[in-house]
Design a protein with these regions (language model features):
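Acidic/aromatic-lined carbohydrate-recognition and catalytic surfaces
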Residues: 2-193, 201, 212-267
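Active-site regions of oxyanion-processing enzymes, predominantly non-cytosolic
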Residues: 199-209
Length: 268
């Protein structure tokens, strides 16, 4: 272990004064001359980032994806998009970043997946009420949760989309190719925790949690900022703190201040 790596393990509040550099791998540096940035290219530029005084790198989504929403439509939480390299490339990048005293934060989309994700492909073919069907939110009518606003009105006319395989509607707060996970299902919690454990056990220093206000649905509400969402985030924080040391969870709640304040907790 290098001195920089040892120092990283002893900085409890490292994020308080971190200089965080946001990187979209695909547009940063191309090591193979194929017109696409990659992890080998990012690795080549670590000395440059270190010279700038950067102490943490925040990576935008790099997972396998149809790329209909710039990678936020994730098709596999456990791998790297082939355009950007391999898991081995990522591990080498992570190791070399740490050797320079640079931490790494990655994006994790909690609310939804791509409709190409294996979970959804299983769900749409599963029987109603079965383990895989309940990974997502289904209905035989598009009339539920009418109080929930449509976020992308220019592109979507409803928060429900018909699936011809399942013969039912599925819920999506974002684009219709991004079905929402069903957080009323404890198995979804377990699956997401496995994803988190995979990356944190690899050595990732933090997660930027995307689209957290929309995790739960409840009739008669806006389906945003529900008490169940706060409880899940507390559960997630406890899970991470129990298993890992000094890891940051940077959650996105794109809400008005009076609605966002509850996400800060009360001493917890």
């Amino acid at each position: 272990m290098t001195r920089s790596e040892a120092d990283l393990q002893d900085e409890f509040l490292w994020y308080k004064d971190a200089i965080i550099y946001e990187v979209h791998v695909k547009s940063f540096f191309d090591s193979s001359s194929d017109g696409m940035g990659d992890f080998r290219g990012l690795l080549e530029k670590l000395d440059y980032l270190e010279s700038l005084g950067v102490t943490a790198i925040w990576l935008l989504p790099f997972y396998p994806s149809p790329l209909k929403d710039d990678g936020y439509d994730i098709a596999d939480f456990f791998d790297i998009h082939s355009n950007y390299g391999t898991l081995s490339d990522f591990r080498e990048f992570l190791r070399e970043a740490h050797s320079r005293g640079i931490r790494v934060i990655i994006e994790l989309v909690l609310n939804h997946t791509s409709d190409q994700h294996l979970w959804f492909q299983r769900a749409r073919r599963a029987k109603p009420g079965s383990r895989w069907k309940d990974f997502y939110v289904w209905s035989y009518t598009p009339e539920k949760y009418k109080e929930a606003r449509i976020i992308f009105k220019d592109f979507e006319s409803s928060n429900w989309a018909w699936d011809s395989v399942a013969k039912a509607y599925y819920w999506h707060r974002f684009y219709s190719h991004q079905p929402d996970l069903n957080y009323d299902n404890p198995r979804v919690h377990e699956a997401i925790f496995r994803v988190i454990d995979f990356w944190l056990e690899m050595g990732v220093d933090g997660l930027r949690l995307d689209a957290v206000p929309y995790l739960y649905e409840l009739e008669g509400t806006s389906c945003e900022n529900l008490p169940e969402t706060y409880k899940f985030l507390e559960k997630l924080r406890v899970h991470v703190d129990d298993k890992f040391k000094d890891r940051i969870l940077l959650a996105e709640a794109n809400q008005w201040p009076e609605d966002a304040v509850a996400y800060f907790g009360e001493g917890n």
